[in-house]
């Protein structure tokens, strides 16, 4: 599994890459910050090019994205890590919502699920072919509150010959009237409008994460990432594995979500 981050917080930029080998449990994480810099994002996902780098010397992380009509080419370079990805964008539905906290504070978020991806990861000179997989884009803009906690989970795959994906979130949207939850089936997004109930124990490395309505995910691996820079702090618990359960579509049809590969997380942030 490969995770990439390009973030602009007005007063600094962050670029990060995370690689997990689910078979061996090996993890590689690189992250860099660049004070007083803002990455230049396009107005819409899938439009234009992105060039971002943060960190200095051997700690620099560089991420480049080039988009055409239906494909994104991604290149990442960091100490001991090189990533090359080709992501197809099928043009299916994606959940996009604005979460309001006040008249001046809000966050727009878009989750683009179940995008076919191929590519390779090179670690310390050894190249690993990733084969065929799934990519998720998490794109957001807005004005966050200084201290925020969120849950986020997603999974993609093919079940009974049908391409399906799951998107679930919580905590940061509670009480706002907005949710970012839904089930994607063969290109159509079915919205889950209610707040979801998350049950998990971050101190139990063998325990499952359960989400009411969508199902549950036994983890194959846990990642804990923490950054503490004075007023800036991030601590994220992530669980990687396979989702099991069912979901109900707009017309009342119950569908299986068994076998969707993805993750669930809790993240506490001070920005």
What does each model-identified segment do?
Residues 1-271:
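Structured soluble/peripheral alpha/beta segments that form catalytic or ligand/cofactor-binding pockets
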């Amino acid at each position: 599994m490969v995770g990439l981050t390009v973030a602009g917080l007005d007063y600094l930029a962050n670029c990060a890459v995370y690689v997990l080998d689910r078979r061996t449990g090996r993890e590689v994480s690189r992250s860099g910050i660049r004070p007083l810099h803002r990455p230049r994002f396009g107005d819409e996902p899938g439009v234009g090019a992105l060039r971002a780098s943060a960190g200095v010397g051997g700690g620099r992380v560089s991420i480049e994205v080039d988009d055409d009509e239906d494909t994104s080419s991604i290149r990442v370079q960091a100490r001991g890590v090189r990533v090359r990805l080709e992501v197809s964008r099928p043009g299916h539905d994606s959940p996009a919502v604005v979460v309001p906290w006040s008249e001046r504070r809000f966050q727009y978020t878009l989750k683009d699920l179940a995008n076919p991806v191929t590519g390779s990861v090179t670690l310390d000179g050894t190249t690993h072919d990733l084969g065929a997989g799934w990519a998720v884009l998490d794109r957001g803009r807005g004005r966050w509150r200084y201290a925020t906690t969120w849950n986020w989970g997603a999974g993609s795959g093919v079940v009974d010959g049908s391409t399906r994906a799951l998107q679930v979130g919580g905590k940061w949207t509670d009480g706002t009237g907005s949710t970012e939850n839904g089930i994607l089936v063969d290109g159509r997004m079915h919205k889950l409008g209610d707040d979801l109930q998350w049950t998990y124990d971050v101190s139990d490395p063998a325990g499952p994460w359960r989400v009411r309505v969508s199902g549950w995910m036994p983890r194959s691996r846990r990642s804990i990432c923490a950054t503490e820079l004075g007023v800036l702090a991030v601590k994220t618990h992530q669980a990687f594995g396979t989702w099991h359960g069912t979901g109900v579509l707009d017309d009342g049809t119950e569908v299986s979500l068994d076998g969707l590969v993805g993750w669930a997380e809790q993240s506490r942030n001070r920005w």
